[in-house]
């Protein structure tokens, strides 16, 4: 029987790089991991709280964290010019202060930088967020999946697979539905495949969205 493996972990060191880059003693490792989680949660909560009500869209592709003894460097990769890009200096300063408060580290400076992603809809996190927004607005899940695939094709993705699991359209029995377009060669290590899992809370309960995107071949 085939065993499922996370496509990002499977390709680390070849086509994927680490989202967190730091070294720690084994006894301090769990503490560093919790710190990373806290930083990411704090940034996402801040963006959710301060983004415009009309869009309701975060557009964060990923958050990279690099740590040194005296510095924590956080790079936020965003797809769209949201509030972090527009009121750049003020927004980032406020965000830095918020994150610094969440973990009490006196000896280390925190530096937050913003990087813009070239093709936002080629990023699985942004596509999953788009689908989640559609599902919250009670759009049919099939329609939302097809629209997400169209957007990925416009971003020059070579293949995409979208899967949604849970009580779809409010049905009593939970099920899994998926659509694939193009090639998604999960077993080939040299191909660049991006993946994300995204839970979304709807009026019928929690649904799980998974997206695999085949971007490029090395």
UniProtKB/Swiss-Prot annotation:
InterPro entries: KH_dom-like_a/b, KH_sf_prok-type, Ribosomal_S3_C_sf, Ribosomal_uS3_bac-typ, Ribosomal_uS3_C, Ribosomal_uS3_CS. CDD domains: KH-II_30S_S3. GO terms for molecular function: rRNA binding; structural constituent of ribosome. The keyword RNA-binding applies. It comes from the Eukaryota. One of its GO terms (biological process) is translation. GO terms for cellular component: chloroplast; cytosolic small ribosomal subunit. Keywords: Chloroplast, Plastid, Ribonucleoprotein, Ribosomal protein, RNA-binding, rRNA-binding. SUPFAM superfamilies: Prokaryotic type KH domain (KH-domain type II), Ribosomal protein S3 C-terminal domain. It holds the Pfam family Ribosomal_S3_C. It is found in: Plastid, Chloroplast. Residues 47-118 form the KH type-2 domain. Part of the 30S ribosomal subunit. Belongs to the universal ribosomal protein uS3 family. This is Small ribosomal subunit protein uS3c. It comes from Nymphaea alba (White water-lily).
